[in-house]
Amino acid sequence: MARLDDATIASLLQEIPGWERQGDALVRTYVFKNFREAMAFVNRVAELAEEARHHPDITIRYNRVHLLLTTHEAGGITERDIALARKLAELAS
């Protein structure tokens, strides 16, 4: 899968609230009421990631979950990252 160009990434990110570009990755931090809610969200993220066969880097800090998406094989952001970011945004809404 090919990397997306800068203009395409910027345009597509306008459609996915809360997600930002950070270098060659898409990132977002979700904040929950407590650790239990954060972990429940992470488990749902894991299910979606398995279905998509595309796995984010996940950092958990008590009630905060930081997600980072990139396609290592392509060396940057691809349609797979955009598609998973969309699904994760829907999951959190």
From Swiss-Prot:
E.C. numbers: 4.2.1.96
GO BP term, pick one: tetrahydrobiopterin biosynthetic process
Transmembrane keyword on record: no
This protein's UniProt keywords: Lyase
GO-annotated molecular function: 4-alpha-hydroxytetrahydrobiopterin dehydratase activity
Protein family (similarity comment): Belongs to the pterin-4-alpha-carbinolamine dehydratase family.
Protein's UniProt name: Putative pterin-4-alpha-carbinolamine dehydratase
Lineage: Bacteria, Pseudomonadati, Thermomicrobiota, Thermomicrobia, Thermomicrobiales
